């Protein structure tokens, strides 16, 4: 028994965890396979951020259990950290359950089933990401304690990862031809607060000093902690794409305080103005929660007005999900699902209009694009203003001789609500 596969659910941080597990197991001589039916060991990296994520994880486990036969089914990640005993009781087909950050325990477990096999350590690099980009996790955990979020209980307090290891990982990927590195953590603005004399600005400067042609993208910046130094660094460094993902969650101060969030609408507007003045070409992305307990219709409409005023380039919306163990779980004034759905749909419809207008404004302009996938007669690419998996894409039709992971110059020819079309020039 030496073949394994990994099914990854949830956020980019889980993607990184899966990649590290794959690397560790291949170095131990196990073989990564993409097809479930060829695997002796099936790993499922789970998520429990909201109810939909929990349901998706459980559905994936049940599907794997149904076709298990003589395979070993191993579940790890956030859901199993939080509900490990319940999973083992309710789904007896599961052979082992691990939490987060237990890679060494997983390796010890899997090795016991192959004691008599002759293993050869592999130098092949398998990945759960395309050949164009890699997520780079720069910190683990979170100490924010937002009232709607279970992450601190699952992943622990915020810990910055070793900068030398981060730089080494990126440098190795640059040498292998990767063209984009997406820095992720629950809140990257906190990076370095627990290190002596090493800050996020220093990390960005050190990353940009690595020789090579690549992009650096920043995801998940806490709005109140984006300072002038960080804005200046992003503006000055050519390798950092002018794209900021700033989850604001709401515009109204009363709701923000119930959420355990800092900041006010006035402060947010001031910060956005400051960023756009310093970086005129910046793409701003944010996420918001609708239907948080006690959110009134007036507060929701003021949120809609705020979104209209700011004109975010990219926007994500979540319907509030009641999570056990969070402070918001016991709040009175829970919003009915039909109201959440209506509010969600209204914001998404408004944002679709904004997005269409912004995408049509790109028509006739030339950009550098990074190709993620080649599929039949089309290629899927992204501009600096597109983060993978969460934003739209560029659809290219003249794809002869193109390769995934390649950068090309393109002309935008059509714009839609979320995607654009282009041709290579």
From Swiss-Prot:
Binding residues annotated for [4Fe-4S] cluster 2, in chain numbering: 142, 146, 149
Residue sites binding [4Fe-4S] cluster 1 per the record: 11, 47, 78
Domain TRAM, first and last residues per copy: 360-425
Cofactor note: Binds 2 [4Fe-4S] clusters. One cluster is coordinated with 3 cysteines and an exchangeable S-adenosyl-L-methionine.
Cofactor: [4Fe-4S] cluster
Enzyme class: transferase
Role noted for this protein: Catalyzes the methylthiolation of an aspartic acid residue of ribosomal protein uS12.
Annotated Gene Ontology cellular component terms: cytosol
Molecular function (Gene Ontology), one example: aspartic acid methylthiotransferase activity
Residues of the MTTase N-terminal domain: 2-115
Catalytic reaction equation(s): L-aspartate(89)-[ribosomal protein uS12]-hydrogen + (sulfur carrier)-SH + AH2 + 2 S-adenosyl-L-methionine = 3-methylsulfanyl-L-aspartate(89)-[ribosomal protein uS12]-hydrogen + (sulfur carrier)-H + 5'-deoxyadenosine + L-methionine + A + S-adenosyl-L-homocysteine + 2 H(+)
Chief location category: cytoplasm
Any one GO biological process: tRNA modification
Segments forming domain Radical SAM core: 128-357
Gene: rimO
CDD domains registered for this protein in UniProt: Radical_SAM (cd01335)
PROSITE patterns from the UniProt entry: MTTASE_N (PS51449), MTTASE_RADICAL (PS01278), RADICAL_SAM (PS51918), TRAM (PS50926)
Originating organism: Thermodesulfovibrio yellowstonii (strain ATCC 51303 / DSM 11347 / YP87)
Keywords associated with the record: 4Fe-4S, Cytoplasm, Iron, Iron-sulfur, Metal-binding, S-adenosyl-L-methionine, Transferase
Compartment(s) where it occurs, according to its Swiss-Prot or TrEMBL record: Cytoplasm
Enzyme Commission number(s) of this protein: 2.8.4.4
SMART domains: Elp3
Protein name from the UniProt record: Ribosomal protein uS12 methylthiotransferase RimO
Any single Pfam family the record assigns to this protein: UPF0004
Family: Belongs to the methylthiotransferase family. RimO subfamily.
């Amino acid at each position: 028994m030496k073949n394994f596969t990994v099914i990854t659910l949830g956020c980019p941080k889980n993607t990184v965890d899966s990649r590290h597990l794959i690397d560790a197991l291949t170095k131990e001589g196990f073989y990564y396979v993409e097809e479930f039916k060829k695997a002796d060991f099936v790993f499922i990296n789970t998520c429990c951020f909201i109810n939909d994520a929990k349901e998706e994880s459980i559905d994936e486990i049940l599907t794997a259990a149904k076709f298990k036969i003589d395979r070993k089914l191993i579940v790890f990640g956030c859901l199993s950290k939080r509900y490990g005993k319940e999973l083992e009781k309710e789904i007896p087909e599961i052979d082992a359950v691990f939490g987060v950050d237990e890679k060494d325990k997983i390796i010890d477990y899997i090795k016991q089933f192959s004691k008599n096999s002759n293993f050869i350590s592999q130098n092949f690099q398998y990945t759960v990401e395309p050949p164009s980009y890699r997520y780079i996790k720069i910190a683990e955990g979170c100490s924010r304690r937002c009232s709607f979020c279970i992450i601190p209980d699952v992943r622990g307090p915020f810990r910055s990862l070793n900068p030398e290891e981060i730089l080494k990982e990126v440098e190795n990927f640059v040498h292998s031809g990767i063209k984009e590195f997406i820095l992720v953590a629950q809140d990257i603005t906190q990076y370095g607060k627990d290190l002596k004399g090493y800050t996020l600005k220093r990390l960005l400067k050190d990353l940009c000093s690595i020789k090579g042609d690549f992009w650096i993208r920043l995801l998940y910046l806490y709005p109140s902690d984006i300072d002038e130094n960080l804005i200046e660094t992003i503006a000055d460094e050519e390798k950092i794409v002018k794209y900021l993902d700033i989850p604001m969650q709401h515009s109204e101060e009363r709701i923000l305080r119930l959420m355990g969030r800092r900041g006010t609408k006035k402060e947010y507007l001031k910060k956005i103005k400051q960023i756009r003045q310093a970086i005129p070409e910046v793409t701003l992305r944010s996420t918001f929660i609708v239907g948080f307990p006690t959110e009134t219709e007036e507060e929701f409409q003021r949120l809609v007005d705020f979104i209209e005023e700011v004109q975010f380039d990219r926007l994500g919306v979540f319907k509030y999900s009641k999570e056990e163990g969070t402070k918001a779980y016991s709040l009175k004034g829970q919003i009915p699902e039909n109201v959440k759905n209506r509010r969600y749909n209204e914001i998404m419809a408004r944002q679709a209009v904004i997005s269409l207008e912004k995408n049509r404004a790109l028509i006739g302009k030339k950009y550098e694009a990074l190709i993620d996938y080649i599929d039949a007669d089309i290629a899927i690419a992204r501009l600096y203003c597109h983060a993978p998996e969460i934003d739209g894409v560029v659809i290219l039709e003249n794809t002869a001789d193109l390769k995934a992971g390649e950068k090309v110059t393109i002309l935008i020819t059509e714009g839609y609500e979320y995607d654009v079309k282009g041709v290579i020039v």
